Amino acid sequence: MKNINPTQTSAWQALQKHYDEMKDVTIAELFAKDSDRFAKFSATFDDLMLVDFSKNRITEETLAKLQDLAKETDLAGAIKSMFSGEKINRTEDRAVLHVALRNRSNTPIIVDDKDVMPEVNAVLEKMKTFSEAIISGQWKGYTGKAITDVVNIGIGGSDLGPFMVTEALRPYKNHLNMHFVSNVDGTHIAEVLKKVNPETTLFLVASKTFTTQETMTNAHSARDWFLKTAGDEKHVAKHFAALSTNAKAVGEFGIDTANMFEFWDWVGGRYSLWSAIGLSIILSVGFDNFVELLSGAHAMDKHFSTTPAEKNLPVLLALIGIWYNNFFGAETEAILPYDQYMHRFAAYFQQGNMESNGKYVDRNGNAVDYQTGPIIWGEPGTNGQHAFYQLIHQGTKMVPCDFIAPAITHNPLSDHHQKLLSNFFAQTEALAFGKSREVVEQEYRDQGKDPAQLEHVVPFKVFEGNRPTNSILLREITPYSLGALIALYEHKIFTQGAILNIFTFDQWGVELGKQLANRILPELGDDKAISSHDSSTNGLINRYKAWRA
């Protein structure tokens, strides 16, 4: 990958000038000028996904200039570097190959002169065999009973991805009850343990190093809870499996290393649901559905790696995001899925985007003088409409939004889905076109009211509109289409990081807090007053000690 400061390119300068021409142009004006706007600014993927980006403050000239930026920063070269196994995560000297985990074509992918696909396929086969034994009931716990509950213990990428996917694919789930524990707050695991029986529960401990503080604290608490009933430590092997590479620590914990599922240092945590970390997904929906998830992602990988940038969906969405973040000063993006099963999708890509591109140092080691990653947030519709949409519609901040919905619901109950989708369509229309003062006044006249007598209310009912949105309409949320959708967002994040000249696949920002926590933890072991920190931290620790006494 080349290290090119995007602001030093001629394309960036052209975009800055173009922004001056576009900043006062409205979405309504763009639609009024072009009756074919939807056709020009939308695209389908495999007849399973329609991406409509027409309700954005862009023209064909805007996209052409953004494409020039992608060319000048050598996006095509960056894509090739990732897919070929180059060590593009230079700060950790690692390749970035989550695409290999779902490489259903099985073509060789080389890292350090070695094809990784045989090992990828071997772990998949091992997960298949293990999961089928659990799901079928062939695997028995220490009292001879089949497993009924699975508890995934992990944090970050070892939790967010599997939890999001198992929830999104709940219509496909089998009889096993799935639980997820991540927070080191003892309340989290305590509440889960209240719901399960030690005789019929399988724990998955997801930690590559088997040293992650939160995960191992929860794992040891689960083990202690289990042994209070089971007694003999040999029974741990029937109720615990590991998603890890540290065979020594796994064995010392009491887990049979035959039930240790490995992954590799070229798998980043927030891109790991496709790996052994996805074992909880397999146990929830079955191996065949997991393969469909991989296949959908692989189809999007092929689209991303082979489609010209002008028609490349992840690239288009990434460029539009850069346009708002760096030229319009938008600081956030909202992800708004109109599907209750997708209720963790925004949280998943909050990590996916903010941990990837929340960087202030470029690939040359210099502080940037432009915007990198946006703040990502969101909730399912229609809940969000009754919470934060007020600010999106009438607030002072620009919040570009992605609206996501399936055309076909898994629960065709009465007219629920039509009502849900009517809101989905209405919101993007309202955000784009708003409601003028003239329309508000005419509505009053139609109601037999005199607008002049309601002058004090009229300004508050005006919607400026011109709020940008993308609409992603899926035919149906299936394992395949979900895989494609997740990969779409992954590649959008990669594209933005490549163009913005930052390292997307490290996360040094999480380290300092952990280091300080390790220093503070021993200081909390007694009741002595602390004076080794700043006055604020000292004051907080000392009040904590006083109150817990």
Curated annotation (Swiss-Prot):
GO biological process entries: gluconeogenesis; glucose 6-phosphate metabolic process; glycolytic process
Catalytic activity: alpha-D-glucose 6-phosphate = beta-D-fructose 6-phosphate
First-tier enzyme category under EC: isomerase
Family annotation (PANTHER family): GLUCOSE-6-PHOSPHATE ISOMERASE
The organism's place on the tree of life at top rank: Bacteria
The encoding gene: pgi
Biological role: Catalyzes the reversible isomerization of glucose-6-phosphate to fructose-6-phosphate.
SUPFAM superfamilies per record: SIS domain (SSF53697)
Enzyme Commission code(s) on record: 5.3.1.9
Cited Pfam families: PGI (PF00342)
Single Gene Ontology MF annotation: monosaccharide binding
Record-stated family: Belongs to the GPI family.
Predominant subcellular localization, coarse grouping: cytoplasm
Pathway: Carbohydrate biosynthesis; gluconeogenesis; Carbohydrate degradation; glycolysis; D-glyceraldehyde 3-phosphate and glycerone phosphate from D-glucose: step 2/4
Cellular compartments annotated: Cytoplasm
InterPro entries to which the protein is assigned, alphabetical: G6P_Isomerase (IPR001672), G6P_Isomerase_C (IPR023096), Phosphoglucose_isomerase_CS (IPR018189), SIS_dom_sf (IPR046348), SIS_PGI_1 (IPR035476), SIS_PGI_2 (IPR035482)
NCBIfam families, per database record: PRK00179.1
UniProt KW keywords: Cytoplasm, Gluconeogenesis, Glycolysis, Isomerase
Record protein name field: Glucose-6-phosphate isomerase
